């Protein structure tokens, strides 16, 4: 059983490597699949079993190349818009959510829809609708062009303004400073988001907070684990795809928390051996849309190069499970 470095679970122990010079890996816990991703991927898998291929999916079901390619081989067809789906066919909406206009377009073509939107994204959609009904200006902190942001803003486009970074704060214009609320994309850096909120509040002192955290539990947990291990790491390897917002944020968090270097890789083969020069401790984690088989591939690659001591850095335990969409709950 590998030694454990526990940074947040009561009653757990911290084992010390006898030879501190020995090459080692710090493995972040939690990492990888979150409840929303697990639900979305299983939705596609069960739909393929229930209805048979092809099953159409609007956009990548989650932002991970391995997952998408695996589902494509099983018969999933990924399309950018519902226009590419044959009339009357089944289409699954990705974990990132869709705007009401997408539902309307699907209905016009008699498509049978299955919604794999993460329930935590749906929560933000509901917040947008509620604040829009009360005629608030909604400042949505997020990344321009990200599918989740497009979908969330689409719930109330006349009320939502995107705030993409600190520089965008100065461009915000509101109608009534007493009726302003901020919401956020679920996969952002917690620290960066709060810096933006602080700047917004300097401009709008009566800025309201969301009813509850919009940044999801899994995003926060993975960032906390990286923060805990980064100061001890000369190198952090984040397994994840470049179009995965939460994976990219983990690289940023690692660098901002004291790691000597941090890189994003899809697979073990993407690792440059030159990164290991002079490195004793390597941190490893993965984004919320990454299956653990890819992390195991990285650990094997590192072990072959002498990094054969693996210590878990545990900051939280996760047990959340979301119910599947009703259309496929009976499929096994």
From Swiss-Prot:
GO BP annotations listed: dimethylallyl diphosphate biosynthetic process; isopentenyl diphosphate biosynthetic process, methylerythritol 4-phosphate pathway; terpenoid biosynthetic process
UniProt binding sites for (2E)-4-hydroxy-3-methylbut-2-enyl diphosphate: 63, 96, 146, 186, 244-246, 289
Source organism, top-level taxon: Bacteria
Catalytic reactions on record: isopentenyl diphosphate + 2 oxidized [2Fe-2S]-[ferredoxin] + H2O = (2E)-4-hydroxy-3-methylbut-2-enyl diphosphate + 2 reduced [2Fe-2S]-[ferredoxin] + 2 H(+); dimethylallyl diphosphate + 2 oxidized [2Fe-2S]-[ferredoxin] + H2O = (2E)-4-hydroxy-3-methylbut-2-enyl diphosphate + 2 reduced [2Fe-2S]-[ferredoxin] + 2 H(+)
Residues noted as binding [4Fe-4S] cluster in the record, renumbered to the chain: 34, 118, 216
Reported cofactor(s): [4Fe-4S] cluster
Pathway: Isoprenoid biosynthesis; dimethylallyl diphosphate biosynthesis; dimethylallyl diphosphate from (2E)-4-hydroxy-3-methylbutenyl diphosphate: step 1/1; Isoprenoid biosynthesis; isopentenyl diphosphate biosynthesis via DXP pathway; isopentenyl diphosphate from 1-deoxy-D-xylulose 5-phosphate: step 6/6
Cofactor, free-text remark: Binds 1 [4Fe-4S] cluster per subunit.
Record: residues binding dimethylallyl diphosphate: 63, 96, 146, 244-246, 289
Molecular function per GO: 4 iron, 4 sulfur cluster binding; 4-hydroxy-3-methylbut-2-enyl diphosphate reductase activity; metal ion binding
Enzyme Commission no: 1.17.7.4
Presence of the UniProt keyword Phosphoprotein in the record: no
CDD domains recorded: lytB_ispH
Pfam families: LYTB (PF02401)
Keywords, ordered alphabetically: 4Fe-4S, Iron, Iron-sulfur, Isoprene biosynthesis, Metal-binding, Oxidoreductase
Residue positions binding isopentenyl diphosphate: 63, 96, 146, 244-246, 289
Active-site residues from the entry: 148 (proton donor)
Gene3D superfamilies: 3.40.50.11270, 4-hydroxy-3-methylbut-2-enyl diphosphate reductase, catalytic domain
InterPro entries reported for this sequence: LytB/IspH
Family: Belongs to the IspH family.
Functional note: Catalyzes the conversion of 1-hydroxy-2-methyl-2-(E)-butenyl 4-diphosphate (HMBPP) into a mixture of isopentenyl diphosphate (IPP) and dimethylallyl diphosphate (DMAPP). Acts in the terminal step of the DOXP/MEP pathway for isoprenoid precursor biosynthesis.
Protein name: 4-hydroxy-3-methylbut-2-enyl diphosphate reductase
Organism (species): Mycobacterium leprae (strain TN)
